Amino acid sequence: MKKLIIIAGLILLIACAGFLYFKKDVLKTTDFKPANSKAKSILDLRPSIIAKLQQVVKDASEGLYILSIDKLEPDVLASKLDVIDGTISVDTTAMQQLDQLKKLPDDVFIIKFHSLHIDGIGIGDLLHKKTIDITGASLNDPVIHIYHKARSYNKEEHKKNDSLTLYQRLMGQMKKIAITAINITHGTLIIHDVAQPKRLTKFNDITIRMNDILIDSSTQYDAGRFLFAKHALLETRNYTFPTPDSLYYVRLGRISLTAEKHEVTVLNAQLQHRGSRQEFEKRLHGRDEMYDVSLPKVVLHNVNWWQLVNREKIVSTKTDFYGGTVSVFSDLSIPLGAKKPMNHFPHQLVMMIPVPVLVSELNFHQLKVIFQQYNPETRSIGMVTCTNISGTARHITNIRDEIRRLPYTSLTAKALFMNKVPMAVRFKFNLANYQSGQFSANVNMDTLNKITINPIAEPLGRFTVKNGQMQQGTAHIEGDNFNLHGTVEIFYTDLHITPLKSDSTHGELKKNHLKSFFANTVFIKNENPSGNDLRQPAVTVGRDHHQNFVAYIWTAILTGLCKTMGIPVKLVVKNE
């Protein structure tokens, strides 16, 4: 999209320049002959204007690009200029020469457009060659193909301001160009990765609005402007692509770039599984989670959007998620597949991203997370929800120098467990030792009662809480790829649980009174602390290859709960 603006701006500016220089001494060209449009009379200067524009494009691009115009319609009385069916193509010989001279840009493009319209070219413009003032310009239906290849000799050039080069090339014959507004509508952008020809990125229905464009000596170094525009907004809608495993689609409803702020806003971002739940599960090679993510609004601040589009780098000083839902579903009736790799913790996944990543701050605002699990033994689905999640992750990166500077990613968040109970979590991920997966976690939860617990306990744990209340609970855990250890501390009173059994006839759960009597009489410790004795058991668990990160932590916490309550761990925690 960046090159779309540059070329659109070039077209607009050189079209204006050509129109204003159509006096005899200005319309002379060095090596171009009028093409496509034939002069109807000695007074019809359109072929000469086209030739002049072609010369300017050639000179401005050092011979790389060739401009073709099918039709040019100047209207001096109405102060208008229309360019119909234009094309900018590549001179392959010049491209090879520029590459040999180490002057070829990383992005080479081909543009076709249906119409370019310019308003507000008045008498003042005609009288002052060195100054151009235009009311507005519009470019309709452009199709832009960009062929991207990162060239090592351009690394230093990338540090320079693109606008400076553009200024130097355009301002050789004039002192000032001012355009009130530029509008580009219904554009199509297709990005080709030269190194990976099969990787194609396509954006449809692109809209670009640029206001208060001023090119003169006062703006050539103005970092607050984007391509000399005081304000520039780029938008595209309905961008969709599949994930590499073909299990999901990523859908982005609208992408907006406020260019001078280096700010990208994405509305209605979604990760959707393909097909129905049954169709999705048929594609799996074994038991796995199914994810669905919906984010109404995502804002990336201080981001290099062109590097992001070209998949070269993901850098943002701050990113905000506003609202949204993350749903995770698993089906225990699906057979286990092959053992999963033991390197899929959050910080390990970031390290696997094939491009440099640095998100200094990631904020969540009112996020909702839903975990659902189907248990074939109870023939029911248990659901755990965490709502009103607000928190911050800091220093998300895979860049070695950044890791040496600060070797940790941290995450702190607050939420409502089951829509009611306040809870807080804090994670610390060791980036310097990411291979072993080192991390620590602290979990704190407020009051729990049977109304909150039973919707989870009955379908997933096959027990129901008859009486009891937890006043508070905390867990501190440290671990890696293979083991977790830590402590779990819960304060509760008057605990009484009832095991459940399946009714083979109706598939319903019924109370198992014999087990209930035995459990509450022999095993269950119905309060903690008991007197002055606070049970705070140490916990050590080994990781199952099929466990994800959340299930791994939950196993450790559940083990601590069982030890505190006096329930044999093997009755609750199952190793698969």
Residue ranges and their predicted role:
Residues 42-151, 167-189, 193-195, 202, ...:
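Flexible beta-edge/linker motif
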Residues 201, 217-257, 262, 266-282, ...:
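Interface amphipathic segments
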